[in-house]
């Protein structure tokens, strides 16, 4: 996995609370088990006027010219609620998002995000309100999300957030569960050599 230390990116404001995983990636697109190819279906029912023609909805935030290429999603409370599909962070990262900033996240989505190198940043509702206004008034504004310092820098101000130290360590060092295991490969090999022949 790629290391996540600091990210600078354009911000797209999704001004909706309780965005569930079925809105993020509808169930009809879940047949695949690989992590790629889901970005084209991200927010499918909101991005397109109908599923057959795939005509873009001109009013949806991700279709607006000013937010093309956004890599940071600004959202409202309880983002990622609903079913526990891991396809939701897959779709967000495949579309190009590196960070989601919101007042709160559904627990399962929050864990899945870290597992897929998508950084979920929790800020207070007051700070989120300020950031929505900032993005609305400043076309092309970029945020600096610093995982080492645990800050979001925007509009000349710094907003502090907290990440569990273990998860922070894993993201900064680009470690997934396999990578963590391989860090102890020497100890695992030594233990295996100590086992009786019939257990090897």
Curated annotation (Swiss-Prot):
Entry superkingdom: Bacteria
Recorded GO CC terms: 3-isopropylmalate dehydratase complex
Positions of transmembrane segments: none
Annotated keywords: Amino-acid biosynthesis, Branched-chain amino acid biosynthesis, Leucine biosynthesis, Lyase
InterPro entries, A to Z: 3-IsopropMal_deHydase_ssu, Aconitase/3IPM_dehydase_swvl, AconitaseA/IPMdHydase_ssu_swvl, IPMI_Swivel, LeuD
Annotated GO biological process: L-leucine biosynthetic process
Enzyme class: lyase
Subunit structure: Heterodimer of LeuC and LeuD.
Role: Catalyzes the isomerization between 2-isopropylmalate and 3-isopropylmalate, via the formation of 2-isopropylmaleate.
Matching PANTHER family: 3-ISOPROPYLMALATE DEHYDRATASE SMALL SUBUNIT, 3-ISOPROPYLMALATE DEHYDRATASE SMALL SUBUNIT 2-RELATED-RELATED
Entry similarity comment: Belongs to the LeuD family. LeuD type 1 subfamily.
Identification of the protein by name: 3-isopropylmalate dehydratase small subunit
Organism: Yersinia pestis bv. Antiqua (strain Antiqua)
Phylogenetic classification of the source organism: Bacteria, Pseudomonadati, Pseudomonadota, Gammaproteobacteria, Enterobacterales
Gene name of the encoded protein: leuD
């Amino acid at each position: 996995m790629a290391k996540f230390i600091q990210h600078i990116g354009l911000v797209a404001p999704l001004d909706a609370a309780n965005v569930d995983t079925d809105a993020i990636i509808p169930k009809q697109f879940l047949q695949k088990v690989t992590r790629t190819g889901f970005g084209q279906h991200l927010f499918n029912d909101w991005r397109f006027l109908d599923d057959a023609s795939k005509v873009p909805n001109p009013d949806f935030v991700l279709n607006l010219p000013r937010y093309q290429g956004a890599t940071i999603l600004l959202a409202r409370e309880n983002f990622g609620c609903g079913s526990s599909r891991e396809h939701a962070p897959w779709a967000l990262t495949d579309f190009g998002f590196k960070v989601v900033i919101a007042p709160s996240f559904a627990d399962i989505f929050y864990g899945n995000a870290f597992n897929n190198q998508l950084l979920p940043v929790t800020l207070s509702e007051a700070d989120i309100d300020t950031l929505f206004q900032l993005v609305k008034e400043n076309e092309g504004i970029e945020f600096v999300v610093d995982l080492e310092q645990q800050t979001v820098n925007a509009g000349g101000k710094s907003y502090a957030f907290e990440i569990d130290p273990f998860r922070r360590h894993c993201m900064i060092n680009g470690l997934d569960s396999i990578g963590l295991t391989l860090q102890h490969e020497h100890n695992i090999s030594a233990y295996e050599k100590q086992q009786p022949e019939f257990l090897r």
